[in-house]
């Protein structure tokens, strides 16, 4: 049974590998969060961890907010069901390769890591607003080799280098790539 609210704060590693955390509102603050093959579900999920490993993990919520320096999401899933803003604030490397999935119903979605690796991964934006990917403020790299980046709205992609070999990037209402 899900707790009303769950807040976990540690100055070390929070390890939910293979585990399950569920609550109405879930807040996790740690130096490192490991959710490898774990499950996190709540109406609202908020994660703050400089190092966040969600490899094989599943995070599902109406609202998701992630703040990390580096996020590894190999074969993991971040699924936001609600239409509110989804926060995936990664300042370093966002590695969604190897079957990673980021999907949201939010009106807009902005991803602004210094490096985005979506090789073999999927980023799906069901909102009708704008999907913005800004790798390194226009100087970073975006790789989407055999990956999929799609939006029902407008796609704006900015990167210093971009590789979409065998990949798909599409925007229902338009696509801008620089």
Give short role names for the model-derived ranges:
Residues 1, 14-21, 34-40, 53-60, ...:
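Short, T/G/N/S-enriched strand-turn elements that build extracellular solenoid repeat scaffolds
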Residues 4-12, 24-31, 43-50, 62-71, ...:
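Well-ordered beta-strand segments characteristic of repetitive beta-sheet solenoids
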């Amino acid at each position: 049974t899900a707790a009303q609210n769950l807040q976990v704060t540690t100055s070390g590693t929070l390890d939910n590998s293979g585990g399950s955390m569920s609550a109405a509102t879930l807040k996790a603050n740690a130096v490192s969060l490991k959710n490898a093959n774990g499950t996190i579900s709540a109406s609202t999920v908020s994660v703050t961890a400089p190092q966040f490993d969600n490899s094989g993990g599943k995070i599902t919520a109406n609202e998701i907010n992630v703040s990390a320096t580096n996020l590894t999401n190999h074969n993991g899933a971040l699924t936001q069901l609600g239409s509110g803003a989804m926060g995936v604030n990664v300042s370093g490397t966002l590695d969604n390769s190897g079957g990673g999935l980021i999907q949201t119903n939010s009106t807009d979605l902005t991803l602004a890591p210094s490096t985005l690796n979506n090789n073999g991964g999927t980023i799906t934006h069901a909102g009708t607003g704008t999907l913005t990917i800004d790798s390194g403020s226009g100087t970073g790299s975006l790789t989407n080799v055999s990956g999929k980046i799609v939006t029902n709205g407008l796609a704006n992609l900015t990167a210093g280098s971009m590789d979409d070999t065998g990949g798909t990037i599409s925007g229902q209402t338009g696509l801008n790539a620089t």
